[in-house]
A protein has these predicted regions:
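Short, C-terminally biased terminal segments at protein or domain edges
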Residues: 1-49, 53-122
């Protein structure tokens, strides 16, 4: 059963897909919109994939990828906003959701790495 982080990341991915569809419908930017589609949906995909991790290292790896994809997505949001392809209000809203995901991922990664250290000492 998906947890709260998976649900939040899926809702964020849906927002990104809708943004991509809007940009495509408006015949606006294509390269940047594909980049944000890829990185923005990859966050949730890696979080979901971590649920089936075969080891703690595998789990940490998937969450680390999701974390990096979140920062890449942040970059694309900035670029789309600064080039006028999306309004500042939308950019701010997307970033608020993204920052929440980053915060949860940061905490989860710190905890998982600390647990791995503790386990390896036993």
């Amino acid at each position: 059963m998906p947890g709260p982080l998976e649900e939040k990341s899926k809702k964020f991915a849906v927002r990104i897909v809708r943004l991509f569809q809007h940009l495509a419908d408006e015949k606006k930017e294509h390269v940047l919109s594909r980049q944000i589609l890829r990185s923005g949906t990859s966050i949730g995909a890696n979080i979901s994939e971590a649920r089936g991790a075969q080891s703690q290292s595998d789990f940490i790896s998937k969450f680390s990828i999701a974390y990096k994809e979140a920062f890449e997505t942040d970059y694309w949001i900035d670029l789309l906003e600064e080039t006028g392809y999306i309004q500042a209000k939308l950019g701010k809203s997307l970033k608020a959701d993204l920052n929440e995901l980053i915060s949860i991922l940061t905490t989860s990664l710190k905890t998982s790495k600390a647990n791995r250290q503790t386990t390896s000492r036993l």
